[in-house]
């Protein structure tokens, strides 16, 4: 397996981009910088990376399960933020994997080049770089996304697709939930009543909680070397030799795991969108 280019960029790389200075592995064309949050525009207005737009996960997810919007709705949202398939999207958040969730949805939609600020907003602040306050800048909407959405449907699966994939020999279902969630001690969310986990799933060593997978990060919040996380997965017999479907509660932590596996060069990987939230409402089977 050949490792894919890492999606994570450091704060100084982004600062150089904003100052139009040369960078390693820079975007090949137009690029957009977006802060991703959930009901957090007030935090963005209080201080954000200069030039960043704000996009809320509620714009791309739908009730009642927080699954991704239908394709035409998603297309309209992305166009309104000036995004199209050939754009490079550089995303950051203030924790909780909102940026990873959005980045994965963008890949699914058809944007091939997504970058993630390693350590998010806090890494920008630690570096002592400038911030600006106020509302999001005026964005000129795009008229044509450039490809039909979803251009990569195999990356994000609904429940029926997940069940079909699991019927194929060798497919691994990997829970990116904490051990207390995986073992049925807690659901991990105040809006998910059921405890337990999907039968046959392997635990993805996701210690911590829904806001932070502690053993996937360094002490400063940046991402550990993917090879170190692969070694943790190996302990649970999770490798890229098999097709792998990641899931969590509603897709955010699973999206983070997806990007780790992608950086490792794992070829056949996907996220089950509905996760435990959906599965627990439609089946009686738990482990």
Where is each model-derived feature located?
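Cytosolic catalytic domains that perform sulfur/thiol-centered chemistry
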Residues: 1-287
């Amino acid at each position: 397996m050949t490792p894919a280019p890492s999606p994570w960029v450091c704060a100084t790389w982004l600062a150089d981009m904003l100052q139009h200075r040369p960078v390693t592995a820079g975007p090949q064309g137009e690029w957009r910088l977006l802060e991703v949050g959930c009901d957090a525009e007030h935090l963005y207005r209080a201080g954000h990376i200069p030039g960043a737009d704000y996009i809320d996960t509620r714009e791309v997810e739908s009730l009642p399960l927080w699954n991704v919007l239908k394709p035409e709705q998603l297309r309209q949202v992305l166009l309104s933020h000036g995004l199209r398939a050939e754009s490079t999207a550089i995303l950051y958040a203030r924790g909780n994997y909102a940026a990873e969730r959005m980045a994965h949805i963008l890949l699914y939609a058809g944007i091939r080049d997504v970058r993630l600020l390693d350590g998010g907003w806090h890494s920008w602040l630690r570096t002592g770089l400038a911030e600006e306050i106020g509302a999001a800048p005026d964005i000129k909407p795009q008229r044509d996304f450039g490809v039909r959405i979803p251009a990569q449907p195999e990356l994000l699966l609904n429940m029926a697709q997940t069940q079909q994939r699991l019927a194929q020999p060798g497919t691994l279902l990997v829970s990116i939930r904490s051990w207390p969630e995986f073992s049925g001690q807690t659901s991990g969310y105040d809006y998910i009543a059921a405890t337990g986990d999907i039968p046959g799933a392997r635990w993805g060593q996701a210690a911590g909680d829904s806001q932070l997978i502690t053993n996937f990060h360094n002490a400063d919040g940046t991402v550990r070397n993917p090879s170190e996380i692969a070694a943790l997965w190996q302990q649970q017999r999770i490798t890229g030799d098999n097709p792998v479907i990641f899931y969590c509660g509603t897709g955010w932590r699973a999206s983070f795991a997806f990007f780790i596996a992608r950086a490792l060069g794992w070829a056949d990987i996907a996220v089950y969108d509905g996760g435990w939230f959906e599965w627990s409402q439609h089946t009686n089977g738990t482990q």
